From Swiss-Prot:
Record's subcellular location: Cytoplasm
InterPro entries with a match to the protein in the record: Dehydroquinate_synthase, DHQ_synth_AroB, DHQ_synth_fam, DHQS/DOIS_N, DHQS_C
Primary gene name: aroB
Organism field: Halalkalibacterium halodurans (strain ATCC BAA-125 / DSM 18197 / FERM 7344 / JCM 9153 / C-125)
Protein name in the entry: 3-dehydroquinate synthase
Binding, Zn(2+): E182, H245, H262
Pathway recorded for this protein: Metabolic intermediate biosynthesis; chorismate biosynthesis; chorismate from D-erythrose 4-phosphate and phosphoenolpyruvate: step 2/7
């Protein structure tokens, strides 16, 4: 078992990484003494883990569960409203707790419900995907709007994050790719040694188990925890965590949510941001080396066919980092050192045109 403590201005809490913790959740929740518990999960996770979690919480407090469809489309206003209604109908009060049992979609949605129900109640993140190692830490919770991803949300830190690496045994290949993108991102922005470690040890997702899984999770989460501790509300440094997300979110929105996983889109965004970095800083980055490794792991690294430069730029202008209509990118000066920088729209347009043209020829 490993425990990492996250320090923020609003809350201090632990991230516990422990095999078998799903069947022991009750022992972590009991000291918090919730008046009632609402588990929010999706249909795929429910089939695998809901009964285990329920058994662990048995007799702790009145227990309820809502099972939603799996997929990015679930992170909608309709489901947010339905969960608020369920919480009211179940009689949750301000001492009640929500448990987010699932991946990033469930964590974001359930966390936003917790942030706003009766002006805020406690919640615990129980991630069941690799992607959620990133989204479960830091307190950013949100739902999507048809005009943009994560546009309606809040900052609301969990009481705890309980992570059972045994869940990796049930992850499909695409979920591995979605989650590993955020791991790579953490190395690129702040920890060159971790990035080198990943390239050395992860040549197949089946390697992510046992001690390697635990080290990967802890080192990746530590990067995020350090940034969140310094900038909880994303006034500055925390925006570095958006490497690859400016274009990545635009690709997700333009293709339609669910057509490409978040991590698959972020990888394309990372490669684009690194190419943009080379043009801005006039120095080379190990892009070919990164692309070769990512392709070996099954990623597509080019902008999907059918997307239009103008539409992508229009969507990027809705990005939360935009200031006074100017697109701001997270760029790399070198591996392990990221910066936030305003980028001339014409330069973005020219590089997008080149990338899209190369993909169609």
């Amino acid at each position: 078992m490993s425990v990492l403590t996250v320090h923020t201005s609003s809350k201090v809490y632990n991230v516990t990484v422990k095999s078998g913790v799903l069947s022991q959740i009750g022992s972590y929740i009991a000291p918090l003494r919730p008046s009632a518990i609402l588990i929010v999960t999706d249909d795929q996770v429910a089939d695998l883990y809901l009964d285990t979690v329920k058994s662990s919480l048995h007799n702790l407090a009145p227990l309820h569960a809502v099972v939603l469809p799996n997929g990015e489309e679930t992170k909608s206003f309709d489901n947010y409203y339905a969960l608020q209604t369920a919480a009211l109908e179940y009689g949750l009060d301000r001492k009640s707790m929500i448990i987010a049992l699932g991946g990033g979609v469930i964590g974001d949605l359930a966390g936003f419900v917790a942030a706003t129900y009766m002006r805020g109640i406690a919640y615990v993140q129980v991630p069941t995907t690799l992607l959620a190692h990133d989204s479960s830490v830091g307190g950013k919770v949100a739902i999507n709007h048809p005009l943009g991803k994560n546009m309606i949300g809040a900052f609301h830190q969990p009481e705890a994050v309980l992570y059972d690496p045994q869940v990796f045994a049930t992850l499909p290949e695409r979920e591995w790719r979605s989650g590993f993108a955020e791991v790579v991102k953490h190395g690129l922005i702040k920890d060159a040694a971790f990035y080198a470690w990943l390239q050395k040890y992860i040549n197949d997702f089946s390697r992510i188990q046992g001690e390697i899984a635990e080290e990967l999770l802890l080192r990746s989460i530590q990067v995020k925890a350090n940034i969140v501790a310094a900038d909880e509300k994303e006034k500055g440094e925390r925006a570095l965590l958006n490497l690859g997300h400016t274009l990545g979110h635009a690709i997700e929105a333009e293709l339609g949510y669910g057509k490409i996983t978040h991590g698959e889109a972020v990888v394309i965004g990372i490669i684009f941001a690194m190419k943009l970095s080379e043009k801005v800083y006039h120095q080379s980055l190990p892009i070919q080396d990164l692309e070769k490794w990512l392709k070996f792991l099954g990623y597509e690294t080019r902008i999907p066919k059918g997307l239009d430069t103008g539409a992508l730029i229009g969507t990027m202008k809705k990005d939360k980092k935009v200031e006074r209509g100017v697109i701001r990118f997270v760029l790399l000066e070198e591996v392990g050192h990221a910066v936030i920088k305003e980028v001339d729209e014409q330069l973005i347009r020219e590089l997008l045109n080149v990338e899209i043209e190369e993909e169609t020829t």
